[in-house]
Swiss-Prot record:
Sequence intervals crossing the membrane: 57-77
Main location: membrane
Localization in the cell: Membrane
Keyword field: Membrane, Transmembrane, Transmembrane helix
Membrane topology: Single-pass membrane protein
GO cellular component, as recorded: cytosol; membrane; nucleus
Organism this protein belongs to: Schizosaccharomyces pombe (strain 972 / ATCC 24843)
Protein name from the UniProt record: Uncharacterized protein C191.03c
Amino acid sequence: MRSNNSSLVHCCWVSPPSLTRLPAFPSPRILSPCYCYNKRIRPFRGLTSYRQASYSLGFPLGLLVFLHSLIVARFFVASKSRSCIVRSLLFWINLDSADSRISVLFQCFFCIDIWTV
């Protein structure tokens, strides 16, 4: 959604494509893989392997993704051109109510595209 005509806020939800049949989630659109809208920012594309691996490794690697996103955020805030502030939201949901041990890591990257002159 747009605000003040100077920034564009976008949420990139990342989830395994095999979870499209999950009924408990609010919107099936969120369950499809999503990348940041700015294709020219390379670090987001570099996180793809981390995202895929985090589904099997869980919290430790998810924490690394979170710390890496903070580093990326600091880098783009310091730059004088187009910058993108990144925040990742990590949470788990149960895939099957009969087996609470099965959980999947979801990541939400809030990208704020800031135009600086």
